[in-house]
């Protein structure tokens, strides 16, 4: 927990400061004088219903004048509690059954730790008083305080950003959240959330530690009852960021020190701002219009797992409330270790999209200045404005004058290949030296001495076999540099023909250790495996599909993200499959142009095979969940389900859609998709309606509702069985 106070400026009451709110939230603890024996106490948070059948209920002490916590314990003779939840859709009932073995949740629990900023405390107090004067049991309260305060504090540390933001922003209790950590008698510990400000207000799930990894398994997540009766509405962002000016210094020890200035416009009056940044970065100071602001940057395992993007939230409280619809300059000073060395001056950038503060990935313009050791090459998105040496440093200024969602950089000791095609330029960089993880291991060769001459054959002396270490040939990390550059330039040109121009005129491609890639606007991170001669790749990636993936698909897929993910985007996890499926199928369109339809059929057959693989419980990977579950598919029982379903099944959906529309209509639809949703987020249903516009006349599923219900919103792969007699 880090709290950086500002000097109190006249007129701001001390009660409203971030420092006091954080101290009160974590230090309030439980109130032994507010402990009650309860029987048949029940309440509901929309679809979630809780029953405190028999046990003790203790409230937390007030924080900023409001109670935000309570604990129920049924750990007494006959004690018990129960939670009941009936998911409203078949898909969500299947999800719940996948994790719990039952489609409806009716779980008895031993205890419940409650944290809330809604009216839960008042609701429970009213129920207690409605049965006459409630009987306090202070002795039990003292025991519960000793037992449960450490547990409550641990949970509050995870949720304090939201608790304090709600308290300081003075939101009405109707917009507050509710959280329950339950100790189930059969299902173990699990979490229940109700958040009226979320797109899906009800979430039930469980933190799982497995094979040195931590997961949050979403058992179910859906729109709450009262919200289902309303027309769906997007929740507007609290503020908009229109411009970034970032000055970053990379020290010789690889520590990154950054000053970020952002133009922020609150949509309404704001007393607190919530930003996100990589947990590897520490925010040291924030100023708003030059005035110091307070910072709260806690660690929060549970909430970070649920967020699913690797970022962590932090709070900023200005010296005085901000006015709505007015632009402010917010200056952040932050530092951290987001760059590591993979050996031989090959570097890995860990926080590629979150090394500076952001909030919801706004489309913004960027001015970037990087200061770094001059013996290194640093690449980033945007056009170079100035590049000079300053003693031991190199200073590079870049400008991104088109609104994009992310700024990113990479560095190393690089060789470069530059190709221009029409109005676009492709610059591809490769490492000059091989990273440690790709170095071939020395092999032992046994040297046998020559046979003995005839006159010594009577000797019983054994031949002296000598093991000699042999260094195998070292792969060239830039073996395919020219080929990769040429192919990316061709892919960019091919895609621009159908999708329109990419967001930036220069596309920079640079290597990253690992077996993945990532496409940012104007900057692609490409696996170092893609640069190697196929014959010199590690044995683990030498099968037919892996060779095709690293040689033909990966760089085209990341190039396609210039359109799908960076020009057109999505805002919610339910729709993220669209960007990966579109990017991957765009790569296959380019593969088809170069290698023919059979190459695409081979890839699709591999995708089908992977979708039909079995999980530990014997079910097919495809059955873990539908495409629209997005990040929810990262489940502990099948860690690879997310990638297999989102990429492989998503690509199949695009292929089947192409077959329904026909090539000409399908490509025209993709071009219209870019034009209609440029610099906007698209939903799955909007994509369905757009695709339906391009169906041939008389198509039997004119709105594609049956197609999407079967392949996007549901699971299952049809099986064809032929019988003859």
Task: Describe the residue ranges of each PLM region.
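Amphipathic alpha-helical substructures
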Residues: 268, 466-474, 503, 598-599, ...
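Hydrophobic helix-coil surface modules that form long, contiguous segments used
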Residues: 224-228, 232-259, 265-271, 276-280, ...
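Glycine/proline-rich low-complexity spacer/linker segments in large multi-domain proteins
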Residues: 231-234, 311, 315-317, 323-324, ...
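Acidic/His/Gly-enriched intrinsically disordered linker/tail segments
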Residues: 458-461, 550, 580, 584-656, ...
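Aromatic/His-enriched, Gly/Pro-containing loop or helix-boundary segments
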Residues: 292-323, 327, 531-554
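N-terminal, polar/Ser/Thr-rich
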Residues: 11-257, 284, 356-360, 705
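Beta-strand-rich binding/interaction modules
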Residues: 271-273, 279-290, 379, 700-705, ...
């Amino acid at each position: 927990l880090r709290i950086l106070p500002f000097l109190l400026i006249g007129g701001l009451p001390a009660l409203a400061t971030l420092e006091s709110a954080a101290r009160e939230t974590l230090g309030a603890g439980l109130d032994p004088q507010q402990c009650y024996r309860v029987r048949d106490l029940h309440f509901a948070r929309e679809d979630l219903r809780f029953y405190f059948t028999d046990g003790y209920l203790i409230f937390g002490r007030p924080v900023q004048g409001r109670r935000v916590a309570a604990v129920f314990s049924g750990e007494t003779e006959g004690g018990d509690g129960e939670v009941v939840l009936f998911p409203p859709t078949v898909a969500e009932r299947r999800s719940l059954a996948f994790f719990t073995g039952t489609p409806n949740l009716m779980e008895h629990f031993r205890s419940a730790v409650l944290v809330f900023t809604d009216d839960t405390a008042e609701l429970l107090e009213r129920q207690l008083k409605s049965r006459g004067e409630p009987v306090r049991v202070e002795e039990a309260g003292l025991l519960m305080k000793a037992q449960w305060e450490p547990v409550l504090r641990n949970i509050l540390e995870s949720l304090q950003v939201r608790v304090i933001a709600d308290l300081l922003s003075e939101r009405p209790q109707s917009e507050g959240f509710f959280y329950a950590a339950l100790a189930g008698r059969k299902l173990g510990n699990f979490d229940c959330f109700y958040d009226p400000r979320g797109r899906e207000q009800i979430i039930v799930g469980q933190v799982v530690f497995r094979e040195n990894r931590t997961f949050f398994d979403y058992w179910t997540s859906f729109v709450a009852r009262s919200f289902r009766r309303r027309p769906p509405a997007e929740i507007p962002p609290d503020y908009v960021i229109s411009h970034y000016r970032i000055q970053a210094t990379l020290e010789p020890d690889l520590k990154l020190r950054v000053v970020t200035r952002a133009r922020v416009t609150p949509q309404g009056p704001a007393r607190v701002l919530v930003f996100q940044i990589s947990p590897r970065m520490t925010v040291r100071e924030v100023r708003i219009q030059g005035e110091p602001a307070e910072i709260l940057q806690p660690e929060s395992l549970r909430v970070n797992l649920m967020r699913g993007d690797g970022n962590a939230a932090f709070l900023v409280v200005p010296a005085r409330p901000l006015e709505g619809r007015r632009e402010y300059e917010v200056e952040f000073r932050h530092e951290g270790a987001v760059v590591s060395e993979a050996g031989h001056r090959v570097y890995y950038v860990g926080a590629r999209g979150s090394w500076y503060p952001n909030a919801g990935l706004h489309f913004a313009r960027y001015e970037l200045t990087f200061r770094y050791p001059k013996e290194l090459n640093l690449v980033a998105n945007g056009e170079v404005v100035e590049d000079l040496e300053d003693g031991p440093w190199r200073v590079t200024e870049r400008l991104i004058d088109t609104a994009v969602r992310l700024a990113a950089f990479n560095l190393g000791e690089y060789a470069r290949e530059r190709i221009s095609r029409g109005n676009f330029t492709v610059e591809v960089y490769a490492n000059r030296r091989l990273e440690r993880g790709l170095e071939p291991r020395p092999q032992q060769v046994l040297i046998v001495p020559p046979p003995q001459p005839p006159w010594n054959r009577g000797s019983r002396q054994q031949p002296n076999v000598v093991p000699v270490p042999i260094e195998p040939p070292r792969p060239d990390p830039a073996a395919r540099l020219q080929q990769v550059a040429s192919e990316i330039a061709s892919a960019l040109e091919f895609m621009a023909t159908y999708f329109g121009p990419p967001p930036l005129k220069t596309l920079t491609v640079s290597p990253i250790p690992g077996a993945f890639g990532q496409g940012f606007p104007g900057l692609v991170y490409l696996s170092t495996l893609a640069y190697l001669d196929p014959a010199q790749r590690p044995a683990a990636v030498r099968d037919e599909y892996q060779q095709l993936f690293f040689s033909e698909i990966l760089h085209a897929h990341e190039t396609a993200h210039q359109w799908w993910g960076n020009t057109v985007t999505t805002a919610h996890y339910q729709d993220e499959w669209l960007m990966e499926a579109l990017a991957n199928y765009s790569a296959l369109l380019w593969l088809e142009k170069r290698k023919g339809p059979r190459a695409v059929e081979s890839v699709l057959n591999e995708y089908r095979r992977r979708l039909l693989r079995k999980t530990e419980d014997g079910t097919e990977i495809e059955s873990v969940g539908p495409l629209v579950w997005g990040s929810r598919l990262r489940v502990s029982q099948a860690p690879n389900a997310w990638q297999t379903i989102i990429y492989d099944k998503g690509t199949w959906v695009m292929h089947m859609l192409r077959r329904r529309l026909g090539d000409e209509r399908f490509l025209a639809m993709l071009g219209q998709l870019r034009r209609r949703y440029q610099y906007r987020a698209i939903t799955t249903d909007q994509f369905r309606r757009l695709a339906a516009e391009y169906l041939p006349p008389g198509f039997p599923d004119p709105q594609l509702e049956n197609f999407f219900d079967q392949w996007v919103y549901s699971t299952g792969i049809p099986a064809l069985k032929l019988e003859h007699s």
